[in-house]
UniProtKB/Swiss-Prot annotation:
Protein name: Arginine--tRNA ligase
Motif ('HIGH' region): 135-145
Biological process according to GO: arginyl-tRNA aminoacylation
Region: Disordered, residue numbers: 229-248
Class in the EC hierarchy, top level: ligase
Classification of source organism: Bacteria, Bacillati, Actinomycetota, Actinomycetes, Bifidobacteriales
Record SMART domains: Arg_tRNA_synt_N (SM01016), DALR_1 (SM00836)
TM region(s), chain numbering: none
One MF term in the entry's GO annotations: ATP binding
Principal place of residence: cytoplasm
CDD domains linked: ArgRS_core
GO cellular component, as recorded: cytoplasm
EC number of this enzyme: 6.1.1.19
């Protein structure tokens, strides 16, 4: 019997108590849905397999003492098939002990459903646009963006496992001053000149500059001798703006796509998939910025002041109004944000019911204006727009911070991390900590094959379970018709209970946008499995020389422990395979492989 089945049973009993007039002043309308009745695993096994606080939840509305109401629940639960014992404890907890067959039923459920176990339609009917990473195309993905890649892709997988339609989106900031600074840096590097004060530096700038020169020369363009003074036209024949030059424009139009390609390749190597690669520049080229401003103007949220155009965001909860067109006629950065949100909500293909933005800690000040813009379009902040803020990543090696990249100068990049510890360890370590908290990445630990390394610990549980399968096959153990009621030891119960908690945990991780909960669950399941593996045998094992020399009573006890009867071995093999299934599913949600050997 699963925790979800117990929730439904408790809900049914609550309804029956109300209809029979036994629940005091409680009415049917005041009952929460079944999912609101918490069923928890007690920390002390003496308190049963599962505990519920339903009586304490309802006692006030019922006008009853919690323990008295809890006793009514206990009386109704006693005698239910699959329940061995029920008792009331403490202020009104209902402690439930299952019989071994009922508890172990989840094992067959896992094996029947395979990697569908725990997946649900909780979020079906909703399209969630999940935008993450979205680093400027002016350099390699840095460690902060790498965290968002791991967290964002894992979150997308978890939301899909809960039935949502998820659009993974990357927003290329390819319009604005940062692109001009990138181009200026390339020109300076190409001429072996100092990096501009506001420019980008690092070996990658030299690499890109060389690639641009080679590409241009192959097309018969002597790019280094193009005019470097202001003036001229871009590739579309439009006049170049102030501070631009033909040479800088040639570097820009060639280098930005190169960075796009490099970013795409990095994401592919990191096992991160995007459905949409959206270019900021398209918002201007397609007139969407003007349309968005027009919509806000029609709604009365735009005014003119000091020669600039302002969004009256204070009317929607922001701390101050925001300029969207500067007095010189150029657009403020926020203008594109407005148009982009409007595009997400109203595009023809997969318009977003919920637009989720994953932003770095340096964007915390953007929340107010973004939510105000959402409200100005008639949407609900927090519902149609959700903003997640991630914290810093500190990379450590030999107990000291790693701050330098061979290629990118003063930042650590996604490629640096992959080279140091691989994709699996990188993704897992970045996803296992709540993105609201800073995270330390210990390169020494994550490269080690030890139980202190969390990704190794979980992957080793999967590999170990696969080895059990191989040994069981060699020993001709057949689990097809296993009697799961034989899974009656304390170690069996801990593993079974961990498996039973997976569906609720997966739902919670989706609701809370919390991939780290998946990682923590996997570590708990792996811990229960490793402990079980060390005390419960599946495949018969010969006694060691030391065990053979023990006294007769000890020797016989060890022989029995290491040579289970066939029926019990078959039941344990099923439990082993159920653990293997759930660990593989959980690792896949985090974008991490589940090896069969280590």
């Amino acid at each position: 019997m699963s925790p979800e089945a117990l929730q439904e049973l408790i809900f049914t009993i609550a309804n029956n108590l109300v209809s029979e007039g036994k629940a005091g002043t409680l009415t049917a309308e005041e009952l929460p849905d079944s999912a609101k009745f918490a069923v928890m695993r007690p920390k002390d096994r003496a308190h049963g397999d599962w505990a519920s606080n339903a009586a304490m939840q309802l006692a006030k509305k019922a006008g009853m003492k919690p323990r008295d109401l809890a006793q009514l629940f206990a009386d109704a639960l006693n005698g239910t098939d699959g329940i061995a014992a029920v008792e009331v404890a403490g202020p009104g907890f209902i402690n439930i002990t299952l019989d071994s067959a009922s508890a172990a039923a989840v094992v067959d459920q896992v094996l029947d459903e395979g990697n569908r176990f725990g997946k649900n339609n909780h979020l079906s009917g909703k399209t969630l646009n999940l935008e993450f990473v979205s680093a400027n195309p002016t350099g390699p993905i840095h460690i902060g963006g790498t965290r968002w890649a791991a967290v964002g892709d894992s979150m997308a997988r978890i939301l899909q496992a809960n039935g949502a339609t998820v659009v993974r989106e990357y927003y290329f900031n390819d319009h604005g001053e940062q692109i001009n600074r990138f181009a200026k840096s390339l020109v300076a590097a190409a001429h072996d000149e100092p990096t501009p004060v506001d420019g980008y530096k690092g070996a990658y700038i030299d690499e890109i500059a060389r690639r641009v020169i080679v590409e241009a020369n192959a097309e018969g363009i002597d790019i280094l001798n193009l005019p470097r003074v202001d003036g001229g036209t871009d590739e579309k024949g439009e006049p170049l703006g102030e501070g631009d030059s033909e040479q800088r424009e040639e570097f820009r139009k060639r280098a930005v796509p190169m960075m796009f390609d490099e970013i795409r390749q990095s994401m592919k190597e990191f096992r991160v998939h995007f459905d949409v690669w959206f270019h900021e520049n398209s918002l201007y080229e397609d007139g969407e910025v003007e349309k968005a401003i027009a919509d806000l103007r029609n709604a009365g949220d735009i005014y003119e002041k000091d020669g600039a155009t302002w969004f009256e965001s204070t009317e929607h909860g922001d701390d101050k109004d925001r300029v969207i067109i500067k007095s010189d006629g150029t657009y403020a950065y926020f203008a594109a944000d407005i148009a982009y949100y409007r595009n997400k909500r109203h595009r023809k293909t997969d318009p977003a019911d919920v637009a989720i933005y994953m932003l770095g800690a340096d964007h915390h000040g953007y929340i107010g204006r973004m939510m105000a813009m959402c409200a100005a379009f008639g949407d609900k902040p927090g519902e149609n727009m959700q903003i997640l803020i991630g914290q810093m990543v500190n990379v450590m090696k030999d107990g000291k911070p790693v701050r330098m990249s061979k290629r990118a100068g003063n930042i650590v990049t996604i490629d640096d991390l992959i080279d140091a510890i691989g994709v699996d360890a990188s993704r897992y370590s970045l996803a296992r900590t709540d993105y609201n908290s800073p995270v330390d990445i210990d390169l020494n630990l994550l490269a080690s094959h030890s139980n202190d390394n969390p990704v190794y610990y979980v992957q080793y549980a999967h590999a170990r379970s696969c080895n059990v399968d191989r040994n069981a096959e060699a020993a001709q153990i057949n689990a097809a018709d296993a009697d799961l009621s034989l899974l009656d030891t304390e170690a069996d119960g801990e593993v079974i209970a961990a498996l039973a908690q997976w569906p609720a945990l997966l739902t919670l991780a989706g609701d809370l946008r919390a991939p780290h909960r998946i990682a923590h669950y996997l570590e708990d399941l792996a811990a229960a499995y490793h402990k079980w593996y060390n005390v419960e045998r599946v495949v018969p094992m010969p006694l060691t020389e030391a065990e053979e020399r023990a006294d007769e009573q000890t020797r016989e006890r060890t022989r029995i422990a290491k040579n289970p009867e066939p029926a019990r071995a078959a039941a344990r093999l099923k439990l082993n395979d159920a653990v293997q299934t759930v660990i593989a599913e959980g690792l896949d949600l985090l974008g991490v492989t589940a090896p069969d050997k280590m």
